[in-house]
Amino acid sequence: MLCHQCQETIKGTGCTQMGVCGKKDNTANLQDVLIYTLKGIAYVSNKTGITNNEIDSHIVDSLFATITNVNFDDKYIIERIKKGLKLKNDLRTKCGCTPEKCGELPDFVTWDAKNDLEILEKAKSKEISLEIPENEDMRSLRKITLYGIKGLCAYLHHANVLGYNDEEIQKFIKKALIDISDDLKSPEELTALVLETGKYVVDTMALLDKANTESYGNPEITEVNIGVKNNHGILISGHDLKDLEQLLNQTKGTGIDVYTHSEMLPAHYYPAFKKYDNFVGNYGGSWYLQKTEFDSFNGPIVMTTNCLVPPADEYKNRVYVTGVVGYPDVKTIPVNEDGTKDFSKVIEHAKLCKPPKELETGKIVGGFAHNQVLALADKVIDAVKSGAIKKFVVMAGCDGRHKTREYYTDFAKKLPKDAVILTAGCAKYRYNKLDLGDIGGIPRILDAGQCNDCYSLAVIALKLKEAFGLNDVNELPIVYNIAWYEQKAVAVLLALLYLGIQNIHLGPTLPDFISPNVAKLLVEKFKLNGITTVNEDMNLLLE
């Protein structure tokens, strides 16, 4: 095992025996086998020009399952490997993809396994390693692309669930899997692939934005209760809005309240969910606090996506996972063939539990996605022209458990009163309960939504560029101080780079999988920087 795909990797250099996230050595290796298998499917599909929805969804959902804090279940990973091998072999049989027809075939195409034991043996082999080739810059470029398409697949999965897809994005995922396995690719070609990944991340986020807004309406300014009521409750975490919709429909009239947790908070901003009387508020804060918060919630918890922390015994029997999320010996809500899910077991469980324990009281405000902010465009533009707003500070991204992330709370507190924070993702929990006031009625914290809603922040920036008649988005009074944690944040970073955004400050640390030479390239081409101290960065960003 060598895993350094997240920001919290041990000593910043990689987890080698067990992940900080809780992922075991054998699970990490099996996930590498799964990715290896996906490369084989992509290769055969690309060579033959044959694909279908089953192949596409298998690749997308499998890559999503390998993201940090999504799936810890070896049985689940092995079953996906088996299915992948069958899809690949059926495709080869159907089209006769032999060396004579398709040329010399790589091992990930020809490899097969008759049983679980052979899969476990493959997990020990060198072929599956992401540490190939020996050149660290080539490895770095390959990993940046791989982690970027993992994040892309998370967003595409959610769009697919709502019935939205894009053939060109699906083609690119396969192309990227093949290209990062091609030893003949030059550093220049792999660098171009990194930026091409950013292009398709933008397309995917746009697709998901369309899926969400056409399904549930455009987010609008909303006050969200952070206290509790006295009824039985169900807590839903993750990002899947369709799961939430089904849960709300099934709990209607049961007397059970539904609370969001962490990245599900922005669901409250969508008009479609405001009709549910039992959709009562948000419970707790960021994902890494769940061991305390899940315990005190008292009722069942539904994990629709990441971030799942290995559940403690005190509440493990109340955790339900669904979709691509997995953990050994935790109850699963399966998806039916028509895409529906039956949450009746969760509902009956909730009736046996005490109401949630109150953690805090009050309200937080959000719903500032692109449609809502652009509706306020005249007010925003006037505030900038008058000097009432001097800077917009994009502080989007991820939260995490390390103490170094207190930097973002301190940074938000010390911003001058003429600065407005634009945020999306769970990074918001470092400052979204601070009372920073407003500027002429414009709140100084504008929350666009989930991490994928960084797309909204990009749209806002591009529209403001037009409104001010500027040639370059970097001429706007917008600076970027972004926190990353896992692969969706990598995808967002690549999207911003593709859009030409420069002078991004990324923290709390730069990714270990970026080699010194590749880091130098990013600094020279995009002026990408790390963070230092609050005061130093404040002076640098607000100069």
Curated annotation (Swiss-Prot):
Its EC number is 1.7.99.1. Hybrid [4Fe-2O-2S] cluster binds at H239, E263, C307, C398, C426, C451, E486, K488. The modification Cysteine persulfide is found at C398. SUPFAM superfamilies: Prismane protein-like. It catalyses: A + NH4(+) + H2O = hydroxylamine + AH2 + H(+). It comes from the Archaea. Catalyzes the reduction of hydroxylamine to form NH(3) and H(2)O. This is Hydroxylamine reductase. The lineage of its organism: Archaea, Methanobacteriati, Methanobacteriota, Methanomada group, Methanococci.
